[in-house]
Amino acid sequence: MSITKDQILEALAAMSVMEVVELIEAMEEKFGVSAAAAVVSGGADAGAAAEEKTEFDVVMTSHGDNKVAVIKALRGATGLGLKEAKGMAESAPVAVKEGISKEEAEALKKELEEAGAQVEIK
C-alpha cells in the first residue's frame, strides 16, 4: 500500500499545531536529523542576512513559574485550544509563531513574558 504526497498533505492539514510538532520531533528522532539545523545555514553572509531580516520567530524557552497564565497567553495569541496550548507550554522550547513581523514578534514576546514565560525572538 502506497501513500501519495496529496494524502500526506491532506493528513498534515487536518492536524493541530501540537500534532505537527510531535510529528516533526518523531521524524527528527527516527531519521537522526534536526529541523533547526536546516534553518541555520548562512556562512559568511550571515551578518548581512541578519540586517535584512523581515520575518521573525517567537520561541518560548520555558513556561516559568506561572504555567496557567502562560497557557492563557498562548491560547489568546495562537487561537489554540486548552489541550494544545498546555501541550505547547509543557514542550518548551517551542516556536509559538513563525515568520511574523518584528513588531508582532516583540508584542507577543512582551505578552508571554508578562505571563511569566521565558521567550526569545529569532
Curated annotation (Swiss-Prot):
For whether the record's keyword set contains Ribosomal protein, the answer is yes
According to its UniProt entry, one GO biological process term is: translation
**Alphabetical keyword list:** Ribonucleoprotein, Ribosomal protein
Lineage top rank: taxon: Bacteria
Q: A single Pfam family, by name?
A: Ribosomal_L12_N
MF-aspect GO terms: mRNA binding; structural constituent of ribosome
The record's listing under CDD domains reads: Ribosomal_L7_L12 (cd00387)
Kindly give the Gene3D superfamilies that the UniProt entry links to this protein.
3.30.1390.10, Single helix bin
GO terms under cellular component: cytosolic large ribosomal subunit
Q: Which NCBIfam families match?
A: L12
Q: Which family does it belong to?
A: Belongs to the bacterial ribosomal protein bL12 family.
Assembly, per entry: Homodimer. Part of the ribosomal stalk of the 50S ribosomal subunit. Forms a multimeric L10(L12)X complex, where L10 forms an elongated spine to which 2 to 4 L12 dimers bind in a sequential fashion. Binds GTP-bound translation factors.
- Function summary: Forms part of the ribosomal stalk which helps the ribosome interact with GTP-bound translation factors. Is thus essential for accurate translation.
Would you tell me the protein name for this molecule? Large ribosomal subunit protein bL12
Give the organism, scientific name. Shewanella loihica (strain ATCC BAA-1088 / PV-4)
**Which gene does this sequence derive from?**
rplL
